[in-house]
Amino acid sequence: MSEKKINLLDLDRKAMRALFADLGEKPFRADQLMKWIYHFGVSDFEEMTNINKVLRQKLAARCEIVAPEISSYQKSADGTIKFAIHVGEGQEVETVYIPEDDRATLCVSSQVGCALECTFCSTAQQGFNRNLTVSEIVGQIWRVSHFLGFAKDTGERPITNVVMMGMGEPLLNLANVIPAMDIMLDDFGFSLSKRRVTLSTSGVVPALDKLGDALDVALAVSIHAPNDELRDILVPVNKKYPLQEFLAGIRRYIAKSNANRGRVTVEYVMLDHINDSTEQAHELAQLMKDTPCKVNLIPFNPYPGSPYGRSSNSRIDRFSKVLMEYGLTVIVRKTRGDDIDAACGQLAGDIRDRTKRLAKKRMQENQISVTMN
């Protein structure tokens, strides 16, 4: 049996240079190769004209450059594109491209499904199968860049921002997320500014500390409730890492971060008559008083079977005004791609659920139905 080839999309620059040392080559050759892969989108070693033929042959014998394929895509009326990315075993994750006047953002997934069980999120209802590999994470960017068109003559890429806000909890896949983000930030990788790469987390505090020790990117935190009692229901990981513990971890992260410019982005989904009262707005402002932040209010995006409704514009406006009375910067997120189920909280993919979460939920619903009848 032939030896399995090394997928170069799995290697950050440190690992790539180690490979080249093993091949008896100088470190700058690894930098050249990364530039071909990430600046120009090249996957055929024979096209890498500044790498000598002998080395190209060595690489072809031991290595490959393989990104997951796009299975299908849908385009929204607002220009948002949702991609279904095939990751093997009949499974798909979803990646969303969001074009704007001054930027083009790609929302990237980190897990097949999600290991957490946030009750307002479609991904969480699908269950969880596994973590994505480095190549499956950066491969989403690489593949969508191909779809949009690498500028092979200049090396200019069509994606300016990446947000780790797709399917999954990134901090539960740090072993792959950190090298993937290293590649995003690397001058020889996707060459993105650390302020243009954002990781969103629901609050796995020990992993947040590890992230802070490893690299500096913009941080968004999923709060969604102003107290532990409600957050235990909406974001069950709160039972393990309650709000004050999470906020302390956030403060530790931004204290040593340049990417965040001294404050974090708080994400707060607006659920009708669940977490959107004026009293809860006052409570949220008090909660965040010692944690420098801006607040991103996210109108809830319904999905089939969701137990929640979207807050009315008047309730969102009233909530926002209360927060601003405390001097907080508040942004109401513009919903993008909801007509193709590509908006925040709507990503589902195609998952073989190892947790049996969806099956258990259906069983419980059937039991309730039988009892009521």
From Swiss-Prot:
The keyword Acetylation does not apply. One of its GO terms (cellular component) is cytoplasm. Its EC number is 2.1.1.192. The active site is at residues 94, 344. Gene3D superfamilies: 1.10.150.530, Aldolase class I (3.20.20.70). Disulfide bonds join 107-344. GO terms for molecular function: 4 iron, 4 sulfur cluster binding; metal ion binding; rRNA (adenine(2503)-C2-)-methyltransferase activity; rRNA binding; tRNA (adenine(37)-C2)-methyltransferase activity; tRNA binding. GO terms for biological process: rRNA base methylation; tRNA methylation. Its cofactor is [4Fe-4S] cluster. InterPro entries: Aldolase_TIM (IPR013785), Methyltransferase_A (IPR040072), RlmN_N (IPR048641), RNA_MTrfase_RlmN (IPR027492), rRNA_lsu_MTrfase_RlmN/Cfr (IPR004383), rSAM (IPR007197). It catalyses: adenosine(2503) in 23S rRNA + 2 reduced [2Fe-2S]-[ferredoxin] + 2 S-adenosyl-L-methionine = 2-methyladenosine(2503) in 23S rRNA + 5'-deoxyadenosine + L-methionine + 2 oxidized [2Fe-2S]-[ferredoxin] + S-adenosyl-L-homocysteine; adenosine(37) in tRNA + 2 reduced [2Fe-2S]-[ferredoxin] + 2 S-adenosyl-L-methionine = 2-methyladenosine(37) in tRNA + 5'-deoxyadenosine + L-methionine + 2 oxidized [2Fe-2S]-[ferredoxin] + S-adenosyl-L-homocysteine. Reaction proceeds by a ping-pong mechanism involving intermediate methylation of a conserved cysteine residue. PANTHER family: 23S RRNA METHYLTRANSFERASE, RADICAL SAM CORE DOMAIN-CONTAINING PROTEIN. This is Dual-specificity RNA methyltransferase RlmN. It comes from Shewanella sp. (strain MR-4).
